[in-house]
Amino acid sequence: MTHLLDPTAGTGPTRDGLDAWRDLPAAQQPSWPDQQALREVVQTLAEVPPLVQPHECDLLRERLARVARGESFLLMGGDCAETFDANTTEGIRGKVRTLLQMAVVLTYGASVPVVKVGRMAGQYAKPRSADLEAATGLPSYRGDAVNELDGDRTPDPKRLVRAYANSAATLNFMRAMATDGSADLSSVHEWNTEFVRSSPLGHRYEELATSIERALAFMRACGLDIAEMPATHGVELYASHEALLLEYERALTRYDRTGGAAYALSGHLVWVGERTRDLGGAHIDLVSRVANPIGVKLGPGTTPETALALAEKLDPDRVPGRLTVISRMGAGRVREVLPEIVRHVERERGPGSVIWCCDPMHGNTHETANGYKTRHFDDVMDEVRGFFEVHASLGTHPGGVHVELTGDEVTECLGGAQQLTAEDLVGRYETACDPRLNNGQSLELAFLVAEMLQAARVNR
């Protein structure tokens, strides 16, 4: 379908209640000191071209519908908080390359397609637990879209325009990598083979890597030119971020003139975080009114009743692929809390009415004795195992994983095959907010999840 956009959606009379959120509690919004500057920026953003197109969002929803039916697996990954300074060619290439490497391993393990969604091209805002930092008395850093990590941290609405521009540049580069041969299956597999050769625990993953190599060799022996096959030469790659800054999201919302639906065209998929998912709040109201695929994060304090109410609010028509529920329980709580949530939602809404996805990062954060916020790889993997165990016990589909990662060999998360310790963190601790898995740890996670997917397939 050809979609025609209404360019006046951000400035003209509102339809379908797109501004109803303005009368609701809006958590985690910056205290913009210059309201006139904010109004001017919002006007500018309402007039610029959208970052993505409705038909792309619709296609992602179709792909996610297969995930909901158990026919695909969802991989979401990228920075905790993107920064303007790190938005470089090599930085973007590294994250995309890592996602592609993980996806190849997961595809083979699951024997189903992997839907690849970057936590990229818009993740420039972060919720914080307090407006001021206790240690410095400065305003909290709320992401590059709001204020600078260095300096006096005064929220500056002009940074929203920079966030838009950086997101556009990232999307442009992601689209190029998806089709220029960078995603060629043989090349990605060779990167993974190098990881297996160099990893201290590479012998554990050698069998899976060898099996993939044999499959590729079989295809070549059959006369199939992998480099010329669209399915193995290019990929579909989508962008997602937390819909946190409401003025930004509203300004980039457009109406599809063809069908009349509103789309949040700041990204293909947007989600509402644990701190802003109040059922009667502004964030849930706004995303409930757009046609994109959307997500909602659920922490360990979520009740089954709340989870169901959120699902009914965000996806009342039960559109396949519409809603992804991203659990972030923590390794110590996932086996206790998640089963009743899944059981209640599936019973009341029917099987496959939502996608169940695991964020094993946010519930496993702690501070080391030397003052670094970190996560241990063992805790991350334990939450993923718990997630799979819950779904195996209920007969439901473990639909995906949502991981904070980078393509660089940073030292931010403990453990893994590299056996990083607290003393190692000082080496390359580069995150602007929360700790990320490095390239090696990300691939290790992918190999381990692939083993879980294989086991789930055998036991199905």
Where are these regions (language model features)?
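Anionic group-transfer/hydrolysis microenvironments
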Residues: G78, G118-M120, G299, D359-M361, ...
